[in-house]
Amino acid sequence: MTLQIGVIGCGAIGQDHIRRLTRKLSGARVVAVNDIDPQQARDAVTKYGLDAEIYGDGHEVVAAADVQAVLVTSWGPTHEAFVLDAIAHGKPVFCEKPLAVTAQGCMRIVEAEVAHGRRLVQVGFMRPYDEGYRALKHVIDSGGIGAPLMLHCAHRNQSVGERYTTDMAITDTLIHELDVLRWLLGEDYTSAQVVYPKKTRHASAHLADPQIVLLETASGVRIDVEIFVNCQYGYDIQCEVVGENGIAKLPDPPAVGLKHAARQSVEIMTDWKERFIASYDVELQAFIDGVRQGALTGPSAWDGYAAAVAADACVRAQQSGAVEPIAMAERPAFYRG
C-alpha cells in the first residue's frame, strides 16, 4: 500500500518534506497540497512533478477522500486547528513544531486524541532520530556510566537575523533540547531558570545573547544549556552526560581531519539543516511506516505538550530572573508505556 499524503503549507519546510516524499523516501506519495499563497502551491507541484490536487484551504486537504494522512508544515499558529481537524477525520497527521503555540492548545490536541482512542499525531522533533543521540541514549540506558547526575549542553548558531528575539532563544532554539533531553533521560522537568552572561557585540540591540538555561528534572538531574546564536564560527550542538561512574558525550558529525601548513583542523558545519538532514529523512520515513503498520512510535502529542509547558516556564524565567516551576498535568495512561 502506498500512503497518500496531503501537505498543508508549501513554504521552505513543506517543500523540503515534499522533496523527501517524492525523491528520497518510500511507501508514500503526495496527492494534495495547499498553501496560503496559491502560487507557492502551484510551484511545488511543478517543481516536484506531483500528480496532486491543489486546494484553496487546508481543511479541504484534510477532508479530501484520497488523502490518507496529513503533513502540517504551515504557519505555526495554524497548526492546532489542522491537527484537530485531522483527528476529527480519523487521519494520521505529522505536524512540524510547534504542535500548537500554547500549552493549552497542545492539551486540546492531547484530549482530542485520547477521546479518539488511537494515536494519530506525530510531532516533528527530529533529534531522537539522530544516530549520535541514539548512541548516547543507548549508553545512558545501558547503565554504563551509572545514573545521570548532570548534563552540560550547548546550542550554537553562526548568526541569526534581525527579527530573532530574546524569547525565540527558547521557542525556536532551546525547544529542541527541551524535547531531546527529556527523551534521553526519560523524565520530566520540574524547574527552569535563565541567566544572562556578558552580551556579545555581534547580537542586535534588542537581543540578549548568549543565554544559559538551568533545568532540573524530577529525579534531581541538573542541566545547563548554553544558547549562543551569534557564535560566528559555525553550527555546533554539544551534549555531555555526567554519570555516577563516567561521562558520555554526543559525538560530533563525521568530518575529515586536515593537517596542512603546520596546522591541524576539522571543518565545522554552518547549516542546521545539514547537521540533521539524515534525521529529517528517518523521522518522516518512521511516520510513513508507522501509519502503514497501524502503530505510530515517534514523538507524540504528549511530547509536544511537555515541550510547550517547559518552554513557557523558560520564557517566564527569562522575564523574572527567578527559578520558575514547571507544572505539568498528569500523563494520561494513553501515553504511557
From Swiss-Prot:
InterPro entries per record: Gfo-Idh-MocA_inositol_DH (IPR050424), Gfo/Idh/MocA-like_OxRdtase_C (IPR004104), Gfo/Idh/MocA-like_OxRdtase_N (IPR000683), MI/DCI_dehydrogenase (IPR023794), NAD(P)-bd_dom_sf (IPR036291)
Domain of life: Bacteria
Gene3D superfamilies from the UniProt entry: Dihydrodipicolinate Reductase, domain 2, NAD(P)-binding Rossmann-like Domain
Coiled coil location: none
Database matches in Pfam families: GFO_IDH_MocA, GFO_IDH_MocA_C
EC number: 1.1.1.18
GO annotation (BP), single: inositol catabolic process
GO molecular-function terms, A-Z: inositol 2-dehydrogenase (NAD+) activity; nucleotide binding
Reactions catalysed, as given in the entry: myo-inositol + NAD(+) = scyllo-inosose + NADH + H(+)
Statement: the UniProt record of this protein carries the keyword Cell inner membrane: no
Keyword line: NAD, Oxidoreductase
Main function: Involved in the oxidation of myo-inositol (MI) to 2-keto-myo-inositol (2KMI or 2-inosose).
Protein family per UniProt: Belongs to the Gfo/Idh/MocA family.
Assembly information from the UniProt record: Homotetramer.
PANTHER family on file: INOSITOL 2-DEHYDROGENASE (PTHR43593:SF1), PTHR43593
Stated name of the protein: Inositol 2-dehydrogenase
Organism from which the protein derives: Burkholderia ambifaria (strain MC40-6)
